Swiss-Prot record:
Name the UniProt record assigns to this protein: S-adenosylmethionine synthase
Keywords noted in UniProt: ATP-binding, Cytoplasm, Magnesium, Metal-binding, Nucleotide-binding, One-carbon metabolism, Potassium, Transferase
Residues annotated for K(+) binding in this entry: 44
Family the UniProt entry places it in: Belongs to the AdoMet synthase family.
Species: Delftia acidovorans (strain DSM 14801 / SPH-1)
Length: 393
């Protein structure tokens, strides 16, 4: 990639229909794990006008009121009024869970290559990434896109901008100079609002746009990056119909929002609703943990990790490191350090990151990475000093 370029990432709020689905799926996972942390869970959710459908495969000893979990999640997000197209009290919730296939379970319970370990729950490839663009070691565009919609929800819930409704999307276009963030070229923020805020694009009140820029955007984005920045606020002019009424929501349909905003490849597997025997989730978390510790150790300014698995096999097919020329030692040497200091077998990942806990609801909105939450063990940099010493730095 050229040293001077524009790069864009987007995020969506907790009220976006796909994120509603993700949050319900992870709330169900947490409710199950609170009783039985060895459950096998693949909880999928569909949301539409006045309707929630829960489906997937669950094998558990837990006794969970799935319908109530779904309603509680919708309430917490803020869909508490029939005018919003879905409300927690009156929406229909359909439940259609099966048990995990025994064909899959036998390969997960005992790995074909390591009888003392668990096998991967599926084949697949996963990526982790870290870079020095922000203190959280995340790419700046996705990091700030998350913070914008997070602030939208905060101001909606605390009543400072009472005309806001739950659905919102943000997009940040960053200008890079010499390969580093220089300024923000464009900010797009579309937020659902009450009907009285605008009737047509030409009648949109200036006070609405001003409130979004002054109360949401400017408090979040670094002022030194706001140089001739273009602001596009509700570009269609009206955003009253939103959430599951505006679009059908599905679990796992915001995988780029959930990860790095397109700054690195994605293996295609979603996270929400999946227990950590599913390497789509746990190995992606582990790959982030590895990449973040490599950058924190000063071994590279940016680091991409790829791991891949075969179903029923414990050991990854490959561990590949790519630092895009920023590494202080060869990528192959960093990969050897990773293999020596991180157990990337499924059971090893679960133990290393303490994943058999009801910690997943927090991950389901505003990004799985780059957030200093105590539950997010994959954000620790506790291996940085060890890696640095092992590299001889």
């Amino acid at each position: 990639m050229a040293n001077d370029f524009l790069f864009t990432s987007e995020s969506v709020s907790e009220g976006h229909p796909d994120k509603v689905a993700d949050q319900i799926s992870d709330a169900i996972l947490d409710a199950i794990f609170a009783q039985d942390p060895y459950s096998r869970v693949a909880a999928e959710t569909l949301t539409n006008t006045g309707l929630v459908v829960l489906a997937g495969e669950i094998t558990t000893g837990a006794n969970v009121d799935y319908i109530q979990v779904a309603r509680d999640t919708i309430k917490r997000i803020g869909y508490d009024n029939t005018d919003y197209g879905i409300d927690y009290k009156g929406c229909a919730v359909l439940v259609a869970y099966d048990k995990q296939s025994q064909d899959i379970a036998q390969g997960v319970d005992k790995a074909s290559d390591d009888e003392l370990n668990t096998g991967a729950g599926d084949q697949g490839l996963m990526f982790g990434y870290a870079c020095d663009e922000t203190p959280e070691l995340m790419p700046a565009p996705i990091y700030y896109a998350h913070r914008l919609v997070e602030r939208q929800a905060q101001l909606r819930k605390d009543g400072r901008l009472p005309f806001l409704r739950p659905d919102a999307k943000s997009q940040v276009t960053m200008r890079y100079v010499d390969g580093k963030p220089h300024s923000i070229d464009t900010v797009v923020l579309s937020t659902q609002h009450s009907p009285d805020q605008s009737e047509t694009a030409t009648k949109m009140k200036a006070s609405f746009t001003e409130a979004i820029i002054e109360e949401i955007i400017k408090p979040v984005l670094p002022s030194e990056w706001l140089q001739d920045t273009k602001y596009l606020i509700n570009p269609t002019g009206r955003f009253v119909v939103g959430g599951p009424q505006g679009d059908c929501g599905l679990t796992g349909r915001k995988i780029i929002v959930d990860t790095y905003g397109g700054a690195c490849p994605h293996g295609g597997g979603a996270f929400s609703g999946k227990d950590p025997t599913k390497v789509d989730r746990s190995a992606a978390y582990a790959a982030r943990y590895v990449a973040k510790n490599i950058v924190a150790a000063g071994l590279a300014r940016q680091c991409q990790i790829q791991v891949a698995y075969a179903i029923g096999v414990a050991r990854p097919m490959n561990i590949t490191v790519y630092t895009e020329g920023t590494g202080v030692i060869p990528d192959a040497e960093i990969a050897k350090l990773v293999a020596a200091h991180f157990d990337l077998r499924p059971k090893g990942i679960i133990q290393m990151l303490d994943l058999l806990r009801p910690i997943y609801s927090k991950t389901a909105a505003y990004g799985h990475f780059g957030r200093e939450e105590p539950e997010f063990t994959w954000e620790r940099t506790d291996k940085a000093a060890v890696l640095r010493a092992a590299a001889g730095l």
